[in-house]
Amino acid sequence: MPRSRINGNFIDKTFSIVANILLRIIPTTSGEREAFTYYRDGMSAQSEGNYAEALQNYYEAMRLEMDPYDRSYILYNIGLIHTSNGEHTKALEYYFRALERNPFLPQALNNMAVICHYRGEQAIRQGDSEIAEAWFDQAAEYWKQAIALTPGNYIEAQNWLKITRRFE
């Protein structure tokens, strides 16, 4: 039974109902419908913290989905799971892949900046200020790109950029 039929969350149920209606009225191929079902089930599992199940659904959606824009969101969500699991190198890889398909994903750029900033803080704790500065500089570049795409967002990042004199 698809996950969307067993989920008890009201918002997920509402999303599933609306998505099913749209899939019936918008012309789509059976492959597109199947890819979306896996994507939707992946989001549902992810929201419940069932990351292994979410990844299985996302990988299956990737196998079926051909549209680069839609694939970018699948890749982004896979990156989120790896970030949550502390697998930052894998997460960065998936965020990069998402951005290759859709360069207008400020949330991917923000998450990449957060990972770089975290690595900079780790380097400081290890006493390596040179490496820390390199990570902070990289974080700044990603945040600047995210802010350029959505100027009203990422206020904390904007403040950090100003405080550290990295804002242009």
From Swiss-Prot:
Give the UniProt family note. Answer: Belongs to the Ycf3 family.
What residue spans do the TPR repeats cover?
A: 35-68, 72-105, 120-153
Gene that this sequence comes from:
ycf3
Per the UniProt record, which residue ranges are transmembrane?
A: none
Q: How does the record say this protein sits in the membrane? A: Peripheral membrane protein
Thylakoid among keywords: yes
Keyword RNA-binding in the entry? The reply is: no
Function field = Essential for the assembly of the photosystem I (PSI) complex. May act as a chaperone-like factor to guide the assembly of the PSI subunits.
Q: Which GO terms describe its cellular component?
A: chloroplast thylakoid membrane
Q: Which domain of life is it from?
A: Eukaryota
Lineage from the top down? Eukaryota, Viridiplantae, Streptophyta, Embryophyta, Tracheophyta
- What's the name of the protein? Photosystem I assembly protein Ycf3
Q: Give GO terms for biological process.
A: photosynthesis
Q: Which organism is it from?
A: Pelargonium hortorum (Common geranium)
Keywords for this protein: Chloroplast, Membrane, Photosynthesis, Plastid, Repeat, Thylakoid, TPR repeat
What Pfam families is this protein classified in? TPR_1 (PF00515)
Q: Where in the cell is it found?
A: Plastid, Chloroplast thylakoid membrane
